[in-house]
Each structure stands twice: as C-alpha cells, then as structure tokens.
From Swiss-Prot:
It comes from Drosophila melanogaster. The gene is Est-6. Monomer. Residues 1-21 form the signal peptide. This is Esterase-6. Glycans are attached at N42, N420, N456, N506. One of its GO terms (molecular function) is serine hydrolase activity. One of its GO terms (biological process) is sexual reproduction. The active site is at S209 (acyl-ester intermediate), H466 (charge relay system). Changing E394D: In strain: Ven-S-13F and Zim-F-S18. It holds the Pfam family COesterase.
C-alpha cells in the first residue's frame, strides 16, 4: 500500500472538509445561486446589505420591466455596504439641489437577529414610503426590530419618480416599473431567504404611506399568496387619491419637452429620446412639475396599465379588482393615524419673510387645491372650482386660512388623502374578501415628527401625524428624539404584532392584549383604537 499517497489523500480530505465546515459554521457567509456573500456582525444581529436582485435598470433596461440578476460572483460578494438610494429629487434634502442617489439601485438588504433558540425565522419584507418620488431603504431603521429578535427583515429598493413611474398609457411606455421591481424582489425573497435562515412560507409584506399603497397594489395580483402569507398597509392603500392618478400621458410628454425631447410625436420616439438622456437630467426635471415647495408631492406615481403591457401589475381600477374577488386572498391589515394629513398640510405653516405659507391659500385656493388634494386630472375646470369651494365651506367655513384655522385644514387633508379611502378600501374587502381584513387607528402624538420637520417649527401641536406610529417600529431620520416609556411599550407591541402576523396559521392578529376583530362579513367597521396607555376594539358605522 502507498501510505504516502493515502496520507496525502487524508490530509487533502480534511482540508476540504475543514474549509467547507468553516463556511457552513460562519454565519456571515451565505451561499446563493450567484455565489457566496459576506455580511457584517453588528453585535445583536447580522446584516447582509446591497444584494442585487435585478440587472441594473440602465441603458436599454431603463423604462423596462426588471430582469432577474444573472451575474455570477467569482469572489465573495461584499454585503457590508449601505444600500444606495434610487435616483430621486428628494423632498427632505436641504438646499436647491435635491438630486440624490443612483440609477443602478435595485438591491435588497437582509437583517437577521442573533437568537440561539431558533434555527429559522419568519420574514418581514419592507417597502419604504416617499410618495413614489423619494425615500430609501436605509432611511427606515432596523435597530428596534433587531433588538426584539423576532423576525428576519428584508428591505427593498425600487425605482422612483420618472424613472420608476413615467407612463404614456400604452405598451411602449406602460409605467409602474417601481412596482415591478418590488414584485421581482418578493420573488427573490421567496427563492433565497431560506439561505439566511428565513422561512419562505412565512413572509409578511409591510409598508408605510406609498409603501403601504404598494403593499395593497401588490396584493391585488391574484397570485400574491404565492409570494407572501399576509400584508400590512400602514397609512397608505391603493384607493388613496395620490396613488393611481390620471393624466400620466400628458406628464410624460411634458417631461420630454423639459429635457429636449419636444420633437417626439409618439410613445416610441419619446421613450427612445428619454432613454438617451442622462438619468440625472430626467430626475432633476421633477422640479418643473412642482408649483411651489414640493407640491404636488407625487407628480409621477402608479397608473393603470394596458392589458397588453409586459408584466403588467394592475390594469383595472383597484375597486373593480376587489369586487371581482380575483386578488391575493391573504390576511390584510390597514391603518391610519388621527392626523395623517399633517404630512401634506404642515408645510403650509412654514414661515417666510412675507409671512406664513398658508396665507397664500386665501387668494389661491381655487388654483392650489386641485394640486394639494389630487383632483386636477379628474374634473373639468368648473367642477374643480365648485368642488374646491364646497370642501372649503365644509371644513373651514367663512374663516380665513391661517394658523387659527389650520387644524380644520389638516383634518380636510387627513380625510381626503387618507381616512376616507382607508374606509372605502376596508369596506370593499369586508364585502368581497375571503381572508381576514383588519384595521387600527393610532392616536398618540410624538414629541417630534414629520410635521415639525416640514413646518420647521415646534410651537404648534400637530397631533398624531403621519408616521408617528410606524417610526416606533422602523426608526426614521425625521424623529431624532428618544422614545418615551409609553412609546417603548407601543414599539414592542407593534413588533410582536408583526412577528405573530407573519407566521399565524389562521391569519389572526393581536396588538398587546387586544385581538383584532375581522371586518369580513361584519355590518359595522371593526376598528382597533391604539393610544398612549392601551388599546380598545370599537365598532363604527363610519370611521371616527
């Protein structure tokens, strides 16, 4: 026997087994079809950031449905880099130049708790908000949820503004590229999350504001149940008037004129010209659609696509889709806060040298209201004026627009932009849905939130504004104060709520000591009220 040869074989075998064992035992190394990636140890959790799920949406792939990422990694992929924002004209960037991000941005980031008691975790997939125009995956934090250690979190980046939503309403330039990005990311999660210790059968899709509306739109695909077990829309749903808008074709050609494509006569030539322009030029042109400040806040947003559009997300009015029953029949929850409209109204209290912005409404209400409240493309000029006068009289009466009447104006914004459409969505789901439909209203003002930032003032009590609940789950830069003791309890309750919802076998939902009541088949709305020191189930004929 050749003992030298046998010994060499044994040594090499041990080296091979040892190297593979170390890869297996190293939680920072993850094997994917593309190759291996290395994450970061953050003490209480592991992170794997900026993982591409789609080919870069640049060049010929701009204004196209995303293509799955195909590249193989010859070296270990570095998954320790903070995800870049998708290219945008950002409302919250100070100064005149608000251009932020990169066109090549389609990544997911995975965050996994350290928990020796579990071999696998349910998964919460997160779609960030930002009116479909701005925002980034990194802007919503993960320290709170990782501290609790209940689920794996996956943050999704998707195309925004004109790069994500410009549309001519035909198959040449159908739009909704950002929504198609989200859907491809969900497929990536389904196929790959087990490699990180996630449970692909227990995925909950969540989002806030435009993220919440995105969740609802994704759910309206009949096969959504193949991608997620449940869905949660915080302060945003498919029926909000700022979500699916009309007039997209006109804005697409206006964008073309603004960037030197004025000779384009049809969708094909417009698309070709827009593809030839620098991405930064297209996104910077957003400012030409704003009549003042960042109004309207969503000039480019989801549209109804033609039925022959490639990989169409939605081709019918969401109301008709829900009535048909042909949508993802999974448990769904929706929410609003008592002054959600503070996000949209607060900038009107910003002070200038010439006075407060709200003063302008006294002379320009008929001009500005259709942009502020998103009915400029749905009514004739006469009907717009009549409606503007009607809602002013209903909410403001004969008062002037000023700081004294601001609370009534904020209530108008809350009702029209959030609450009324939340009620309508829930009403449709309770009548035509087969899976549980839940709702909550939150009333517990934060010491600092989005309204104080936009108004640049702390001397006004805005109430419970857009994000005051959600930012207790996923931290946000607009809230730079410590949580109060009551908010710490609420934060834990929210996080436990999501963890349980992600893995619930029967679709039940619970917050703290309160079980949500299902709205499907109920004559009255079942609404869970969440406030500073508890929760309570309430029944309503109409939302309070």
């Amino acid at each position: 026997m050749n003992y030298v040869g046998l010994g060499l074989i044994i040594v090499l075998s041990c080296l091979w087994l040892g190297s593979n064992a170390s890869d297996t035992d190293d939680p920072l190394l993850v094997q994917l079809p593309q190759g291996k990636l290395r994450g970061r140890d953050n003490g209480s959790y592991y992170s794997y950031e900026s993982i591409p799920y789609a080919e870069p949406p640049t060049g010929d792939l701009r204004f196209e449905a995303p293509e799955p990422y195909k590249q193989k990694w010859s070296d270990i992929f570095d998954a320790t880099k903070t995800p870049v924002a998708c290219l945008q004209w950002d409302q919250f960037t100070p100064g005149a130049n608000k251009l932020v991000g990169e066109e090549d941005c389609l990544t997911v980031s995975v965050y996994k708790p350290k928990n020796s008691k579990r071999n696998s975790f349910p998964v919460v997939a997160h779609i960030h908000g930002g009116a479909f125009m701005f925002g980034a995956a990194w802007q919503n934090g993960h320290e709170n949820v990782m501290r609790e250690g209940k689920f794996i979190l996956v943050k999704i980046s998707y195309r925004l503004g004109p790069l994500g939503f410009v549309s001519t309403g035909d198959r040449d330039l159908p739009g909704n590229y950002g929504l198609k990005d989200q859907r491809l990311a969900l497929k990536w999660i389904k196929q790959n999350i087990a490699s990180f210790g996630g449970e692909p059968q227990n995925v909950l899709l969540v989002g806030h504001s435009a993220g919440g509306a995105s969740v609802h739109l994704q759910m309206l695909r009949e096969d959504f149940g193949q991608l997620a077990r449940a869905a949660f829309s915080f302060s945003g749903n498919a029926l909000d008037p700022w979500v699916i808008q009309k007039g997209a074709r006109g804005r697409a050609f206006e964008l073309g004129r603004n960037v030197g494509c004025e000779s384009a006569e049809d969708s094909t030539s417009l698309k070709k010209c827009l593809k030839s322009k620098p991405a930064s030029e297209l996104v910077t042109a957003v400012r030409k659609f704003l009549i003042f400040s960042y109004v309207p806040f969503a000039p480019f947003s989801p549209v109804l696509e033609p039925s022959d559009a490639p990989d169409a997300i939605i081709t019918q009015d969401p109301r008709d889709v829900i009535k048909s029953g042909k949508f993802g029949q999974v448990p769904w929850a929706v929410s609003y806060v008592t002054e959600d409209g503070g996000y949209n109204a607060a900038l009107l209290l910003k002070e200038r040298k010439s006075g407060i912005v709200i003063d302008d409404l006294n002379e320009r209400w008929l001009e500005l209201a259709p942009y502020l409240l998103f009915y400029r493309d749905t009514k004739t000029k006469k009907d717009m004026d009549d409606y503007s006068r009607k809602i002013k009289q209903e909410y403001i009466g004969n008062q002037r627009f000023d700081i004294e009447s601001y609370s009534e104006l904020q209530r108008l914004f809350t009702d029209i932009l959030f609450k009324n459409s939340t009620q309508e969505s829930l009403d449709l789901h309770r009548k035509y849905g087969k899976s549980p439909a839940y709702a909550y209203v939150y009333d517990n003002p934060a010491e600092k939130g989005i309204a104080q930032v936009l108004a640049n003032r702390t001397d006004y009590d805005f109430g419970t504004v857009h994000g005051d609940d959600y930012f207790l789950i996923f931290e946000n830069f607009v809230r730079d104060v410590e949580m109060r003791p009551d908010e710490q309890i609420i934060s834990r309750n929210f996080i436990n709520m999501l963890a349980d919802f992600a893995s619930s076998d029967n679709g039940s939902l619970k917050y703290g000591e309160c079980d949500f009541k299902d709205n499907v088949g109920s004559e009255k709305f079942q609404l869970l009220a969440i406030y500073i020191d508890g929760c309570q189930n309430r029944q309503h004929v109409e939302f309070p």
